[in-house]
């Protein structure tokens, strides 16, 4: 074998805690791709809806870029019995939620690439009969195109404060990058696909569409050519369309798929170093 193989065991694969550094970006900063210098990198992820013995891949963008956003809404507190003396941050938040969804439906060129804005957390108030002073919305942006990402960021920074102002309140928007676009180098992908077909069989190597999940493996790919793909772990007898999703209590995969993942990664390594 004409070369060196480096195994990377990454902590905080799902990202570090808010306000902390971690995951792939921290490893890159600490020199994981140096000494010896890495020329190419491969990543593999199990998938509960892909049949055992198969793998799926896509050249270029395969997983979305992701940002975490926080919108802080400021109003004026009052008793629930006298809403006319308040500036209700909950009402403002509802209008902001509706407003930013129009960024996807009315501003984004969805025939080009998909995009997602999801608000997963809303916090406001502590009593049923008090209109609170503030509210906070926390969510994620997913994009497969940098121009669309910039459009969404710009429109969110425009819409939220202007909507809040229209109701007599104010709003600030803070957006932080959590993962760049997971981008499979086309030249490395072509070489990898030929290797996978040799190892697993041509019919077991399938092309896929991009997904709006995100992966901080992209931090490695920003420095060196990379190839990221998915390994089959579908439970026998389950329908791919009904397989429990990742990050749910029902998630389950067939361990029989792991041997195919080992074979795939070994084959990729040996073929690259020939």
Predicted feature descriptions by range:
Residues 1-121, 126-130, 240:
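Histidine/acidic-residue-rich, glycine-tolerant segments that coordinate divalent metal ions
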Residues 94-274:
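Metal-dependent amide/peptide-bond hydrolase catalytic core
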């Amino acid at each position: 074998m004409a070369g060196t193989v480096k195994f990377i065991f990454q902590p905080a694969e799902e990202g570090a805690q808010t306000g902390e550094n971690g995951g792939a970006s921290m490893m890159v900063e600490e020199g994981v791709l140096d000494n010896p210098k890495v020329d190419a990198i491969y990543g593999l992820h199990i998938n509960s809806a892909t049949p055992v013995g198969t793998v799926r891949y896509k050249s270029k963008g395969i997983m979305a870029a992701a940002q975490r956003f926080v919108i802080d809404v400021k109003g004026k507190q009052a008793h629930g019995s006298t809403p006319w003396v308040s500036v209700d941050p909950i009402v403002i938040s509802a209008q902001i939620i509706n407003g930013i969804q129009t960024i996807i439906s009315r501003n984004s060129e969805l025939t080009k690439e998909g995009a997602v804005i999801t608000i997963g957390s809303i916090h406001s108030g502590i009593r049923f009969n008090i209109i609170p002073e503030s509210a906070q919305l926390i969510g994620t942006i997913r994009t497969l195109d940098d121009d669309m990402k910039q459009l969404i960021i710009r429109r969110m920074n425009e819409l939220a404060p202007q909507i809040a102002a229209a109701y007599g309140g104010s709003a600030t928007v803070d957006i932080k990058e959590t993962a760049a676009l997971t981008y499979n180098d086309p030249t490395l992908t072509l070489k990898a696909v030929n290797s996978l077909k040799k190892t697993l069989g041509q019919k077991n190597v399938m092309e896929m569409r991009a997904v709006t999940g995100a992966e901080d493996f992209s931090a490695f790919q920003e420095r060196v050519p990379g190839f990221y793909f998915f390994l089959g772990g579908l439970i026998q007898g389950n329908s791919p369309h009904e397989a429990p999703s990742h990050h749910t209590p029902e998630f389950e995969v067939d361990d029989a798929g792991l041997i195919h993942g080992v074979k795939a990664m070994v084959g990729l390594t040996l073929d690259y170093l020939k």
